[in-house]
Amino acid sequence: MAWSPRHSAGRRLQLPLLCLLLQGATAILFAVFVRYNRETDAALWHWGNHSNADNEFYFRYPSFQDVHAMIFVGFGFLMVFLQRYGFGSVGFTFLLAAFALQWSTLIQGFFHSFRGGYILVGMESMINADFCAGAVLISFGAVLGKTGPVQLLLMALLEVVLFGLNEFVLLSLLEVKDAGGSMTIHTFGAYFGLILSRVLYRPQLEKSKHRQGSVYHSDLFAMIGTIFLWIFWPSFNSAPTALGDGQHRTALNTYYSLTASTLSTFALSALVGGDGRLDMVHVQNAALAGGVVVGTSAEMMLTPFGALAAGFLAGAISTLGYKFVTPILESKLKVQDTCGVHNLHGMPGVLGALLGGLVAGLATREAYGDGLESVFPLIAEGQRSATSQAMHQLFGLFVTLTFASVGGGLGGLLLRLPILDSPPDSQCYEDQIYWEVPGEHEHLAQGSEETETQA
């Protein structure tokens, strides 16, 4: 498609101007509000008797490092399956996450760590910011290849605010348990992105259908993302939990759930595939559903068997979703879900929230002993019954779906503004429209455009 000189000039300026504006505004807010916390500040840490080994850095940084790798390597490479959108998948993941980390530090800080007029930052705030970035990248997966970088940054600007608000309502007001984010991260990110995709529906997307598939090497690169996510997911779910048995139990439950979801994915993929052959799309995504489904319940006394059962069910549901649900969403509901986030994050996230409610409802002093105070402090103090905690968990799911749906709708209306740069229907899933693409890839893209023009 040929762009007019005026449109090309405006398009060229939108991204740099928005990046500079967002970074400038964020920097000013950091200067005014953000300060080191006690364990990061030189004066505060050395005031009193502290051993360096007691600093939270040495307890939290290994988990943070794993979560950080998941955000930038895992999510980025998982989305490179599109044959001609590898630069956009990894590059825009990099851009969105870098902005979301700064913006969410401010938003989450105002809600959770605002003390004496300042936001205090340290290892915990870094981990929480990564979690927020994860939700943004899940939403990105639903509109991958169909939106420009300016639209994506504005999506992140809105979504981070709503993520922080939803998280505050769930964790601070309702006091639900959701350490691994089945609700706050996966369910919120998935349905925010799906509603956004519905509002941005493209009836002429068929013009770019030939680019929506994968090729051998793009699927292979996407498997790198899968393996990174699979390996580090126990750290993702356990990073914010209390040190000791809770963190240990969370990692263990996630570990077993992932193994079970992998086996069920291979089983179902071969069962529904042609001639019993495996589909790499299923393996890349549904094998990870085990990490999503135990996000809420992993720190609870789920039991190893419960973790296996949950993971197996999540892998099966996710695989069947890719095979049967995704086509229905597109044909009947007009939801164009590029990465299938409904199958990897949406349905397993909702299932995980329901599982968390069930396990919370079964909590007893006999099962948890003195550990009940760290997992369910309100039950331990007698302020809530186990049944009441379960109902709060389920209400948290309803609140999350409400925030995600309303937020996704508002985000879609914002991104539909005509002034915002967006790829035309015939150039979706194409790197060349936003990136300098060297070598053979560029020539192939040009040849494809010439063929379309002649047709």
From Swiss-Prot:
Transmembrane segments: 14-34, 62-82, 87-107, 125-145, 152-172, 180-200, 220-240, 254-274, 278-298, 300-320, 344-364, 394-414
Descriptive protein name: Ammonium transporter Rh type B
UniProt lineage: Eukaryota, Metazoa, Chordata, Craniata, Vertebrata
InterPro entries according to UniProt: Ammonium/urea_transptr, NH4_transpt_AmtB-like_dom, RhesusRHD
Self-association state and partner proteins as the record states: Interacts (via C-terminus) with ANK2 and ANK3; required for targeting to the basolateral membrane.
GO cellular component: basolateral plasma membrane; plasma membrane; spectrin-associated cytoskeleton
Extracellular side: 35-61, 108-124, 173-179, 241-253, 299, 365-393
Positions annotated as glycosylated: 49
Placement of sequence motif Basolateral sorting signal: 429-432
GO biological process, one term: transepithelial ammonium transport
Cytoplasmic side: 1-13, 83-86, 146-151, 201-219, 275-277, 321-343, 415-455
Role, per record: Ammonium transporter involved in the maintenance of acid-base homeostasis. Transports ammonium and its related derivative methylammonium across the basolateral plasma membrane of epithelial cells likely contributing to renal transepithelial ammonia transport and ammonia metabolism. May transport either NH4(+) or NH3 ammonia species predominantly mediating an electrogenic NH4(+) transport. May act as a CO2 channel providing for renal acid secretion.
Stored Pfam families: Ammonium_transp
Annotated keywords: Ammonia transport, Cell membrane, Glycoprotein, Membrane, Transmembrane, Transmembrane helix, Transport
Natural source organism: Bos taurus (Bovine)
Recorded catalytic activity of this chain's protein: NH4(+)(in) = NH4(+)(out); methylamine(out) = methylamine(in); CO2(out) = CO2(in)
Family according to the record: Belongs to the ammonium transporter (TC 2.A.49) family. Rh subfamily.
